[in-house]
Amino acid sequence: MFTSIPSLDSVLQCLLPAFTQPSFQTHIEVLLGWVMCLSRRTEYGVFQTIQAGTPVSRKERHPFDRFYNFFSRSAWTVHDLAHQVAVAVVVRLNPRGLLYLVVDDTLLHKRGKHVYGLGWFRDAVASTAKRVATASGNHWVVVGLAICIPGTSKIYCLPIHAMLHRAGKNHKSEAMLAKEMLGDILEWFPDRKLVFLGDGAYSTKN
């Protein structure tokens, strides 16, 4: 089992309110396993890294049940985790003044009939001015906080909220998901003024 360094541990402790104590411990193990994984970072590969000292057959899934259940059954939500991440980032890096938020979407390439939320979406990286490329994957709408790192002139955009965009007319559009996340952030920081930036895809009447 890996042990986090003190500087990382202080960051992880900020996220504790989003978890129960058991799920928080599993969260730490999964995060450290992801950081230390030298192979392809699939769930199985990360879980193997966590238990690197214990050989596990690919036919035996039960040693990793606790880690698989962390994502499907544990008592935590992406919304609550995003809240704690946002608070930690704002308090430490943007405690006063305007909050500059940037929204965009990204495609995480995935295949497989068991992958949740899978769909075919425009691949912005592979597309050109004359050709629109599509690819299979999970399509995420992400809101980041643009900040100037103290002591430098560099501006970075740190993700603080994200929602999965599902393909099809029966699911919410990217703009609607962005609107919901903006509403969340307004609730989290009711005393702050926000500047919300996005491209034409997020310019809608609703």
Regions found by a protein language model. Give the residues of each.
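Conserved, well-structured functional cores that handle cations and Mg-NTP chemistry
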Residues: M1-N206
